[in-house]
Amino acid sequence: MNNDETIDTLNTLIETAKDGEYGFRASAQYLSSPEVKQIFARRADACLQATAELQSLVVGMGGYAEDTGSAMGTVHRGWMAVKGTLAGYSDRAILDEVERGEDSALSSYRKALEQPLTPELRSVVERQLEGVKRNHAQIRALRDQVRSEAA
């Protein structure tokens, strides 16, 4: 993999991390649970840290680091807003949509690891993937908890 391809791969992950940050922050404002709002704020901060780390790597490689999320992430957040307006912003619906976003993040990180990265970059991407997995598991557990409370 040449330098430009590696930078493209990292920039895709930057967009993914920015999507996560924006998604957690946007979703938090509609949640009813203060505890879940705090969890979302921490998740957004973790995504912001992941973004900064990836941006630093891209700049260190002589590339231009993305500083926005993806078009698909913007569409997903827009869909969440429309769906929330039509169906109401229930914690369950929000958690369902955030989990869908985390599914997408998992896919992006796994795809990046299919690329021939340097050992240093692979280590960073693997570590960040573990964070995405933790986010996903936590969101799923919260969603399941909300479902069981509603039953």
Where is each model-derived feature located?
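N-terminal/domain-start segments enriched in small and hydrophobic, helix-friendly residues
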Residues: 2-15, 76, 88, 144-151
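A structural signal for well-ordered alpha-helices, especially hydrophobic packing surfaces
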Residues: 21, 51, 55-58, 79, ...
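Conserved alpha-helical segments that form or flank metal/cofactor-binding pockets of metalloenzymes
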Residues: 38-73, 139-142
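Carboxylate-rich helix-loop segments that flank metal/cofactor sites and access channels
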Residues: 56-106
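Preference for long, well-ordered alpha-helical segments
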Residues: 98-151
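Alpha-helical bundle segments that constitute or directly flank the non-heme di-iron/ferroxidase center
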Residues: 2-32, 92-116
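Alpha-helical scaffold segments that form or flank carboxylate-/histidine-based iron centers
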Residues: 5-13, 34-52, 91-95, 120-132
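Charge-rich, acidic-biased intrinsically disordered regions
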Residues: 38, 45, 65-82, 122-130, ...
